[in-house]
Amino acid sequence: SALFLAMHYTPDTLTAFSSVTHICRDVNYGWLIRYIHANGASLFFICLYLHIGRGIYYGSYSYMETWNIGIILLFLTMA
């Protein structure tokens, strides 16, 4: 869904809001693509936090190299 949104979105500060309005009103099922993208991104981060919680619960933080690589990947995902 991100690819379809990127085809119509403009990141310029003056036209960003109007491009989102264009996606929701003028693109066929643009409103649906936008909501699927937003909910999919939220679900992705919920799964990411659950995965971290599972690692904390099972004591995976004791494997320092693996844990640090995971933290770096988390920060890169959020950047």
Curated annotation (Swiss-Prot):
Keywords, sorted A to Z: Electron transport, Heme, Iron, Membrane, Metal-binding, Mitochondrion, Mitochondrion inner membrane, Respiratory chain, Transmembrane, Transmembrane helix, Transport, Ubiquinone
GO-annotated cellular components: mitochondrial inner membrane
Membrane topology category: Multi-pass membrane protein
GO biological processes: mitochondrial electron transport, ubiquinol to cytochrome c
Major place of residence: mitochondrion
Subcellular location per the Swiss-Prot or TrEMBL entry: Mitochondrion inner membrane
Note on cofactor: Binds 2 heme b groups non-covalently.
Cofactor: heme b
Residues annotated to bind heme b b566: 51
Other observations noted: Heme 1 (or BL or b562) is low-potential and absorbs at about 562 nm, and heme 2 (or BH or b566) is high-potential and absorbs at about 566 nm.
Function per UniProt: Component of the ubiquinol-cytochrome c reductase complex (complex III or cytochrome b-c1 complex) that is part of the mitochondrial respiratory chain. The b-c1 complex mediates electron transfer from ubiquinol to cytochrome c. Contributes to the generation of a proton gradient across the mitochondrial membrane that is then used for ATP synthesis.
Protein's name in the database: Cytochrome b
Annotated gene: MT-CYB
